[in-house]
Amino acid sequence: MIGRIAGILLEKNPPHLLVDCNGVGYEIDVPMSTFYNLPQTGERVVLLTQQIVREDAHLLYGFLTPQERTTFRELLKITGIGARMALAVLSGMSVQELAQAVTMQDAARLTRLPGIGKKTAERLLLELKGKLGADLGALAGAASQSDHATDILNALVALGYSEKEGLAAIKNVPAGTGVSEGIKLALKALSKV
């Protein structure tokens, strides 16, 4: 299994790359989220990879972050989702946006992606629930509500609450609330549960 490639980026043609690694050129497909963050051709690049071996081909898919690769792997486990569709999902939305859609069970958001119909979107939501750090999406939503959501969440976890409980409580904290006041409001919300 090829898990990582480091080399010189020779070609960039969305979504395909050619990376020279000690004289061997690897063709790698990447999601657009990775493509837009690549260095210029001729520069060094490090990609985390997922190798897929088929009867007729050995394919490499590359990612800049471990979260993207993990999400790609989770998508591949879903019936009816192949590598191309998984790549399309990651090209159409970030890992955080996907996690948030899963947390909110927002099928409409997924159906906007090319090749994803209503049934496929519902299957994605069902099978990804709790598997790709859905709390990441919830935290992103909570962060938009409160400037100090991460600090408040860390304090709640330090007090013995789970991240899931903390994220639910943070939703009750208005935007712009300070950390200490936010902790008080979150604790008040948790005491009502």
Curated annotation (Swiss-Prot):
HAMAP family: DNA_HJ_migration_RuvA. The keyword Electron transport does not apply. It is found in: Cytoplasm. Gene3D superfamilies: 5' to 3' exonuclease, C-terminal subdomain, DNA helicase RuvA subunit, C-terminal domain, Nucleic acid-binding proteins. The keyword Ligase does not apply. Residues 65-139 are annotated as: Domain II. Homotetramer. Forms an RuvA(8)-RuvB(12)-Holliday junction (HJ) complex. HJ DNA is sandwiched between 2 RuvA tetramers; dsDNA enters through RuvA and exits via RuvB. An RuvB hexamer assembles on each DNA strand where it exits the tetramer. Each RuvB hexamer is contacted by two RuvA subunits (via domain III) on 2 adjacent RuvB subunits; this complex drives branch migration. In the full resolvosome a probable DNA-RuvA(4)-RuvB(12)-RuvC(2) complex forms which resolves the HJ. SUPFAM superfamilies: DNA helicase RuvA subunit, C-terminal domain, Nucleic acid-binding proteins, RuvA domain 2-like. GO terms for molecular function: ATP binding; four-way junction DNA binding; four-way junction helicase activity. Residues 144-193 are annotated as: Domain III. The gene is ruvA. One of its GO terms (biological process) is DNA recombination. GO terms for cellular component: cytoplasm; Holliday junction helicase complex; Holliday junction resolvase complex. Belongs to the RuvA family. This is Holliday junction branch migration complex subunit RuvA. Keywords: Cytoplasm, DNA damage, DNA recombination, DNA repair, DNA-binding. Has three domains with a flexible linker between the domains II and III and assumes an 'L' shape. Domain III is highly mobile and contacts RuvB. Residues 1-64 are annotated as: Domain I. The RuvA-RuvB-RuvC complex processes Holliday junction (HJ) DNA during genetic recombination and DNA repair, while the RuvA-RuvB complex plays an important role in the rescue of blocked DNA replication forks via replication fork reversal (RFR). RuvA specifically binds to HJ cruciform DNA, conferring on it an open structure. The RuvB hexamer acts as an ATP-dependent pump, pulling dsDNA into and through the RuvAB complex. HJ branch migration allows RuvC to scan DNA until it finds its consensus sequence, where it cleaves and resolves the cruciform DNA. InterPro entries: DNA_helicase_Holl-junc_RuvA_I, Hlx-hairpin-Hlx_DNA-bd_motif, NA-bd_OB-fold, RuvA, RuvA_2-like, RuvA_C, RuvA_C_sf. Residues 139-143 are annotated as: Flexible linker. The lineage of its organism: Bacteria, Pseudomonadati, Pseudomonadota, Betaproteobacteria, Burkholderiales. Disulfide bonds: none annotated.
